[in-house]
Amino acid sequence: MIKSFKEGLSGSLARFYLDGKRSKDIPVTIESSLKRKLDIIESATTERSLFSPPGNNYERLSGSLEGWSSIRVNIQWRLIFQWRDGAAYDIYLD
């Protein structure tokens, strides 16, 4: 479940996901994949469920992003978030 977006509900990622609003911050070429990955995160109730399908390339990050996780949208873009208590917090596109 997605609990919060890093940019808040007025940010481009939240507006894209919740309202279907396009943004110059989100490339048109990744819109369908991005929506699908956000749906996967929204429906997840356990961290383990994020490992499947393997195309998610779910990983726990390290270094300066320790405590954060990510799912690949494509080779260039990924969704980064903190997974706590069965939910994703502060999700953003990078």
Feature map (PLM): residue ranges:
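Basic, Lys/Arg-enriched alpha-helical interface segments
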Residues: 1-73, 84-94
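Histidine-centered metal-chelating micro-motifs
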Residues: 77-79
